[in-house]
């Protein structure tokens, strides 16, 4: 079984996130989504639009998502969450490149394939 993991704030979730999730699901047999926690959201934006439990429930309800968790990380990365899940693939959206992400170090260490550029940047949650 090929396990795929993706991550995001989904704060708020928008059509670009749906495309990202749908494309990620096509990469493997099971898709696990890491939802960045409220602490990470505050680090990035100063505050959350929606709290982590609401964002998690919305993500879990999406048909292509097999499982979703709240990130266990305390910084702006999902490195510890990736280490916990141990996916075969870690995928990023169209606005991220694998050379730019801090998660590339843990993925390389664990032999996890990184795929970037899933979908186009259709929207940005920071516009809301």
Give the predicted meaning of each segment.
Residues 1-128:
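Nucleotidyltransferase catalytic core that binds NTPs
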């Amino acid at each position: 079984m090929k396990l795929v993991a993706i991550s995001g704030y989904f704060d708020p979730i928008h059509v670009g996130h749906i495309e990202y999730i749908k494309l990620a699901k096509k990469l493997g047999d099971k898709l696990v989504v890491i939802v960045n926690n409220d602490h990470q959201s505050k680090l990035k934006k100063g505050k959350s639009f929606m709290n982590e439990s609401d964002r998690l429930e919305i993500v879990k309800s999406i048909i292509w998502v097999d499982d979703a968790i709240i990130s266990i990380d305390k910084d702006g990365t999902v490195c510890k969450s990736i280490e916990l899940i141990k996916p075969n693939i870690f995928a990023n959206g169209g606005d991220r490149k694998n050379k730019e992400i801090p998660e590339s170090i843990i993925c390389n260490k664990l032999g996890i394939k990184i795929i970037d550029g899933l979908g186009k940047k259709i929207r940005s949650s920071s516009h809301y």
